Each structure stands twice: as structure tokens, then as C-alpha cells.
């Protein structure tokens, strides 16, 4: 069935519905439960989820999408410590003020504060050799983390540490057992692995700081800046710090050489400052720090605006209240305590990034390194992991937080205008990192247009998008347009680029139509099928092609490339997973693979294959079920593809197995990098029973709900999702009801859910093989996407 989106909405709202009474069913349609204020989502969250294994999350104290993430750093020199913290570590270096959440690359960790007793030590040491360094041992039994708060007792000094945060500031409270000191280390930060393929660690490499400044600016005020060249090469960060004790005894260091006594300010590259605290044991020592990407004056203004007082407990209470409101957008009832904790922690991790990157006065540093000004309502943000988050994180926001979704999308459009590189790829604090392939920001923008997000100036955006689509010859785009594929002997990651450029073409066609460029839109829609040039019917896999048109040899579907000299033909996946990457053209995949039965068999083979990977596979291909890899994003939509060939009950079985075996509420509870909330967003949506295989299409595919009841605050009201009878064995959907009537399709339009309503999944322990089997009940084939 080929439908435009307009046809889809009409059909979705008016197709023949069967009433429950006519079907002989009785459903509980009573009053909504759990609205009496007794639901406390903050108490269910464990920020430690994902801090172990390859999750790369941080237990730092922060607010939703805040600029500051104040938390402990245990290591900066290995891949699994990209966030600065790993649950396996036994020592803490100190507490820095911003951290990436779940990423596979490392940066930030600005303004490290080290509280200690005893002699002043300047050496950070290493996790393997902490002796003689300023690191201190700790036990997880002495840690506590909750949204907006972190606490730990340091074993070596006995200092009790508490941390909390506002949007732009972090607040510390230290209880010293004896005289001590605070060390501020501006040399501290990420030391990312130099080899992006092997992810080999380089713990001997220092953070690259080229310019820094530290200054005593008042009786209780310290200010500073640094210019850092790591993943975000050239970013600038400034801070203002107030301390609750006198700054009478301070010591400055440049490259660990002490400045003369009486020094009140210093400039250089490798700066540290020690505040000596002879009376530290007499009262708690309070520290509050604000950050700015603009200048020191901006940091001071942020500090005065958000943390004018010294009431640590009030800041902590306010943070908890903010998180209660944020997490209350999705409430779930029933299930096990483990499932409740996993769900709440996943929802929490979808609200860490992107991060605020605008001062309280409206100034921000843009993608052109210039200082701009706007309103707080417009805002500016950082840390968009778009290759990951276009899949589930941004679609989740279109449902549960459409205002925030619109703010992010409009910000991304502004970045496209400000950046010398055009469309953002992976922007971090005003710097384009150029990380990952494709320009999946266009998927985020197109989805927003399809779902009716307002305020997107498409006419101004389209020339930027068009230039990329038709004029840019870099990144393999010239052969992609000329040959229909990118040759593996000339361009790295050629197979994945060919596949993913097709997804982007599909999205750019929507933007073109919105701009009135319909001829360009038609060309882009046709070009979005280029992925088919890589499908090899002899092997049943997509394969890299060479310039002469032949498939690259040798071929092993487990490999990321065709030879050891140029082994990365695929991006964070192999041919097993990449064969199903055309999420925008599922009917096309079914056609080239030989029809419904053959497509179903290929999916079955993916999940049944031996999970062994080749020795050179990177660690971020993880969370394996067969050759399906939940631990990396290219697989995230694949379990839902069964709906297109009429067997959604297999989606239900696969999705429940993934949720049950690869997610839990422990530090190792994520199957891979959380990637700024994408890994967690997959769980949130899957637990609700829906997923957006093609975000641009504007439809949700049904899966298998995890909880008997969920309440979602949507833009149009409240969406209640019920699953009577759901349980460990009752994972199969028998029937679906929407607003009291039987719903015969295995999908539903976003426009339906966004208005709010009552979605009921009748569950059972055996598959209903008739549900979603009929061709007219399957997800539609889109010839084009019409705009609302």
C-alpha cells in the first residue's frame, strides 16, 4: 500500500474500527490512576546505571539539559572513561564541572577541584599507579547518586563530599576532618585515544591546553579561562568560583613551578591554584562555580544569577524538584522493581544532553566562534550526537516534550547558518567535531516538519541543504551522485556512507518540498534508493563495491572492511547489521531480498547467527544477540522490521528479549555507549510499546509494552497506554484498542498519539499470528511524505 502522509492521517483516523462491545470484549476504561502525587520518579532513578561496562555515563549532579554536570573523575586516559568516571575504578582524582554522557569520544571535564588533607600534591598519577598522586581511594558503599546530587566519602582524607547543581552552576560542600586544601587544576581534562578505529588508550598523553588564566578577583572570588584542543579542537571555557572561606593563603603554579609569594594572578598553559585551609575542620567548606563559553564576565553573571546564596540544601531541593517535573512526563505503573528502576534511569539519561550553552544574559559562542545574543526561550545548546540520536531520542521528544524538541531543532537550524561548515554533524561547545558520517540533522529537521513543529525557516535553510545535496563533492558525495554508490577503494566507510546518505536524501526531500523545491525533492527521493546498488543477491548482504563496479573481496559479513589495509567499509557495524540499514525504504529491502518470506528468513538469520566477531572488531559493537548488536545504533530499528512482512509477533519476541537481557538497573545495565541518551531512548519507547523505524514517516510501529500502565504527558494532553495481562510470559499482543475501538494495524500515526488518548494492548502468552498479518494492516509504503 503506497500512502502519502496526508492519506495516512486520513486513513489512520477514519478506517473501519470495531467497537469492543461488538467484539465481545470488556476493557477497563476507568479513571486514570497514580495522579495523587504519590509517584516519585526521582526515587526510582539510579544515575550509576551505565557507568560500568561500555555505557560511558556519569553520576554527576546536573539539571535537565544543563550546562554543568558536576561530578567525580576517576580516569581520563582510556576509552571506557570517556565521561571521566568508570565504575570499575578505585580512586577519584577530583570533581570537575562538565561531562559528556555516554559518548564514544571524550572531552570537557573543566575546572577540576581536588579537596585534600596533608601535604600539597600536584601530580594526578594514573589509575594503575595512584601512589604519590592527589588521587584518593573510595568505596562505592560510600557513594550516593541521585538526580541533581552526588556524594562520596574519600577514604584517604576522610573528607565528606557533596555536590549539587543549577543549570549553569555547580555547588560543592566539603566536610574536612582536619586542616586541608583545595587544588584547582586547569591542566585536567580528556586524553582521548588517538586511533579512532582501535580505540587504543594513550594514558601518557596530556590534555592540550594552549592558553589559560587564573586570577583572584575578589575576597572570595576566583576566575579563570582555558583554550583547549581536544575532540572539540579550539573550544574556550571560562569560570567564576566563590569560596566560603578567605583566600588569604593561595599558591599559583605554572607547569608545576610555583609562582612567587603574593601572586594574585597567572597566565600560561598548565596552571594550578591551591587554596590552603588551616581552619577547614571548623565548618563545612562551600564552593560554587559557574561556567561560560563567552567570557569571565559571563561566568560571574551566571554565578550571581543562579547561585547568589550559600544554601546548599536549598539548591539540592530545587534540583530535585526540577527533575521531578521532568521525569514526571512519563509515568509507569506495575512491573518489577528492576523494570521500574531501569525505565526511570533510562528516562533520566534522555534528559542529560544536549547541554545548555548560553549565558544568563543571552550571550553565547556560536559555531563561527563569534559571540551572539538571543533570548533564553530561543536558547543555544551543545553536544548533539546526531548520528545516534536521530533514531529514537529526537522522536521521543516529539511525543513527550514537543516544546523542547522544537527548541533543539530551531537551534540546529541556527547552527547551520552560523557554522562555516554548514549543517551541524556533532557540535560541541561551538566547535564542529566532524564526528560520524552523514548529515543526520536533516532527519531531525524533516521529522519536525512532518510532525508540525513551528518556527523553522525552511526558505532560508534550503540553500544550505541544497548546496550539500547537489554541489558538495567531498565525503564521497561526487561518486555517490555519479555512480550511485561510493567506491570502497577510494573512500573510507564507503558502504555505510552510501546507505546512510540515502536516509539523508529521503529527509532532504521533505525539506525541499517544504521549501517549494519539488523538482529537487523528486531527485532526492529517487537518489534515496542508491543503497540498492550495494545489495548482492548472491550472498544476501549489502557489500562494498570498488570503482570498477565489482564487489570488494574478500568478503566476510562479520568484517568491518574488505582487507586489513582499508578495513573500515562500515561504520560501527558489519554487513550483517548494515544489510538492514535502509530504514526509510523497508519495502525496497523486502523487494530486493525476494519478498516477505525471504525477508523474514533474513531477519531470523541475523538473530540466530553465531555472535562471534572478528579480532579487530571495536568494543562498541556490543550487546549481541546473534549478529544483531543492540550496543550500537545501526541495529536499533531492526527488531521492528518484522511488522513490514506481516509477522509483528516476532518483533514482540525480539524486543522483549532485548529489554530483558541487555538492560538492567546496574552500572553495567546498558548494552553499549548511551550516546547522549539514544541507547536509553530506545528502551523508553520500547517499554511503552512503540518505536519510530523511519522518523521522517511520522508513524510509530507497535512493539510490546513492558508495563501494565503508562501515562505520557504529550503536547495535546495525556496519552494512557495500558497492557492488561502483560507479564514475563505474556509478551505477545493479541489486539490493540485506540480510544475504545479495536485498532487493526501494527502501527499508528504520530498525529493520533500526539493529541493524547487511550491505547490498550491486550496481551497473551502465545502469539496472535493474525494481528498485523494482512497487507492492509502493515506499515505503509511511502512514495513521498506530505507536510501537515
Predicted regions and their residues:
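Signal peptide processing junction and immediate N-terminal pro/mature segment
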Residues: 22-29
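Accessory carbohydrate-recognition regions in carbohydrate-active enzymes
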Residues: 30-443, 447-499, 507, 512-533, ...
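Extracellular attachment/recognition segments
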Residues: 732
Amino acid at each position: 500500500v503506497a500512502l502519502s502522509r496526508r492519506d495516512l492521517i486520513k486513513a489512520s483516523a477514519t478506517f473501519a474500527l470495531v467497537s469492543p462491545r461488538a467484539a465481545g470484549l470488556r476493557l477497563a476504561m476507568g479513571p486514570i490512576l497514580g495522579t495523587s502525587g504519590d509517584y516519585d520518579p526521582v526515587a526510582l532513578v539510579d544515575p550509576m546505571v551505565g557507568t560500568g561496562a561500555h555505557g560511558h555515563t556519569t553520576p554527576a549532579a546536573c539539571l535537565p539539559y544543563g550546562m554543568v554536570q558536576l561530578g567525580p573523575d576517576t580516569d581520563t586516559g582510556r576509552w571506557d572513561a570517556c565521561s571521566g568516571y568508570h565504575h570499575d575504578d578505585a580512586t577519584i582524582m577530583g570533581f570537575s564541572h562538565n561531562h559528556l554522557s555516554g559518548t564514544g569520544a571524550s572531552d570537557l571535564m573543566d575546572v577540576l577541584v581536588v579537596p585534600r588533607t596533608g601535604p600539597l600534591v600536584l601530580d594526578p598519577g594514573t589509575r594503575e599507579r595512584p601512589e604519590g598522586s592527589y588521587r584518593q581511594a573510595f568505596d562505592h558503599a560510600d557513594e550516593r547518586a541521585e538526580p541533581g546530587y552526588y556524594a562520596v566519602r574519600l577514604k584517604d582524607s576522610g573528607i565528606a563530599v557533596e555536590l549539587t547543581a543549577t543549570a549553569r552552576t555547580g555547588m560543592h560542600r566539603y566536610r574536612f576532618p582536619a586542616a586541608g586544601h583545595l587544588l584547582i587544576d586547569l591542566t585536567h581534562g580528556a586524553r582521548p585515544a588517538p586511533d579512532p578505529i582501535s580505540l587504543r588508550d594513550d594514558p601518557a598523553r596530556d590534555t592540550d591546553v594552549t592558553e589559560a588564566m587564573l586570577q583572584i578577583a575578589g575576597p572570595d572570588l576566583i576566575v579563570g579561562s582555558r583554550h583547549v584542543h581536544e575532540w572539540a579542537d579550539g573550544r574556550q571555557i571560562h569560570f567564576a568560583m566563590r569560596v566560603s572561606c578567605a583566600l588569604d593563603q593561595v599558591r599559583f603554579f605554572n607547569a608545576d613551578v610555583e609562582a612567587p609569594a603574593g601572586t594574585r594572578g597567572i597566565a600560561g598553559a598548565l596552571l594550578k591554584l591551591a587554596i590552603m585551609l588551616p581552619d577547614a575542620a571548623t565548618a563545612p567548606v562551600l564552593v560554587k562555580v559557574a561556567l561560560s563559553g563567552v567570557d569571565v564576565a559571563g561566568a560571574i553573571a551566571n554565578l550571581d544569577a543562579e547561585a547568589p546564596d550559600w544554601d546548599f540544601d536549598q539548591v539540592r531541593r530545587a534540583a530535585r524538584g526540577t527533575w521531578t517535573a521532568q521525569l514526571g512526563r512519563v509515568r509507569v505503573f506495575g512491573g518489577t522493581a528492576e523494570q521500574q528502576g531501569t525505565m526511570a534511569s533510562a528516562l533520566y539519561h534522555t534528559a542529560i544532553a544536549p547541554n545548555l550553552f548560553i549565558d544568563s544574559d543571552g550571550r553565547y559562542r556560536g559555531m563561527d566562534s563569534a559571540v551572539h545574543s538571543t533570548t533564553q526561550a530561543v536558547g543555544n545548546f551543545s553536544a548533539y550526537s546526531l548520528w545516534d540520536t536521530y533514531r529514537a531520542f529526537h522522536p521521543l521528544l516529539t511525543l513527550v516534550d514537543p516544546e523542547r524538541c522544537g527548541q533543539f531543532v530551531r537551534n540546529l537550524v541556527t547552527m547551520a547558518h552560523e557554522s562555516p561548515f554548514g549543517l551541524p554533524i556533532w557540535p560541541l561547545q561551538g566547535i564542529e567535531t566532524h564526528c560520524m558520517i552523514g548529515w543526520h540533522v536533516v532527519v531531525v529537521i524533516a521529522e519536525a516538519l512532518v510532525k508540525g513543529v513551528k518556527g523553522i525557516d525552511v526558505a532560508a535553510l534550503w540553500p544550505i541543504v541544497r548546496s550539500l545535496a547537489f554541489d558538495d563533492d567531498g565525503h564521497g558525495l561526487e561518486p555517490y551522485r555519479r555512480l550511485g554508490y561510493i567506491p570502497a577503494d577510494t573512500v573510507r566507510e564507503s558502504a555505510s556512507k552510501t546507505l546512510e546518505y540515502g536516509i539523508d536524501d529521503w529527509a532532504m526531500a521533505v525539506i525541499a518540498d517544504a521549501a517549494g523545491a519539488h523538482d529537487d525533492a523528486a531527485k532526492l527521493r529517487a537518489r534515496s534508493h542508491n543503497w540498492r546498488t550495494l545489495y548482492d543477491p548472491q550472498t544476501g548482504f549489502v557489500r562494498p563495491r570498488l570503482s570498477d563496479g565489482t564487489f570488494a573481496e574478500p568478503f566476510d559479513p562479520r568484517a568491518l572492511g574488505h582487507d586489513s589495509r582499508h578495513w573500515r567499509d562500515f561504520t560501527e557495524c558489519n554487513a550483517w547489521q548494515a544489510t538492514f540499514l535502509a530504514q526509510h525504504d523497508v519495502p525496497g529491502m523486502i523487494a530486493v531480498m525476494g519478498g516477505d518470506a525471504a525477508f523474514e528468513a533474513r531477519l531470523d538469520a541475523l538473530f540466530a547467527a553465531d555472535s562471534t566477531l572478528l579480532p579487530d572488531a571495536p568494543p562498541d559493537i556490543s550487546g549481541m544477540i546473534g549478529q544483531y548488536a543492540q550496543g550500537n545504533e545501526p541495529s536499533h530499528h531492526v527488531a521492528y522490521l518484522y511488522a513490514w512482512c506481516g509477522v509483528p509477533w516476532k518483533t514482540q519476541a525480539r524486543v522483549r528479549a532485548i529489554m530483558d537481557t541487555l538492560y538492567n538497573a546496574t552500572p553495567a545495565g546498558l548494552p553499549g555507549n548511551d550516546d547522549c541518551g539514544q541507547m536509553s531512548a530506545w528502551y523508553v519507547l520500547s517499554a511503552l510499546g512503540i518505536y519510530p523505524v523511519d522518523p521522517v514517516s511520522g508513524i510509530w510501529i507497535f512493539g510490546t509494552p513492558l508495563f501494565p500502565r503508562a501515562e505520557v504527558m504529550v503536547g495535546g494532553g495525556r496519552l494512557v497506554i495500558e497492557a492488561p495481562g502483560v507479564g514475563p510470559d505474556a509478551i505477545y499482543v493479541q489486539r490493540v484498542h485506540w480510544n475504545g475501538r479495536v485498532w487493526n494495524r501494527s502501527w499508528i500515526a504520530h498525529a493520533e498519539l500526539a493529541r493524547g488518548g487511550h491505547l490498550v494492548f491486550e496481551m497473551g502468552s502465545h502469539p496472535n499470528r493474525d494481528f498485523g498479518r494482512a497487507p492492509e494492516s502493515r506499515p505503509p509504503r511511502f512514495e513521498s511524505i506530505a507536510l501537515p
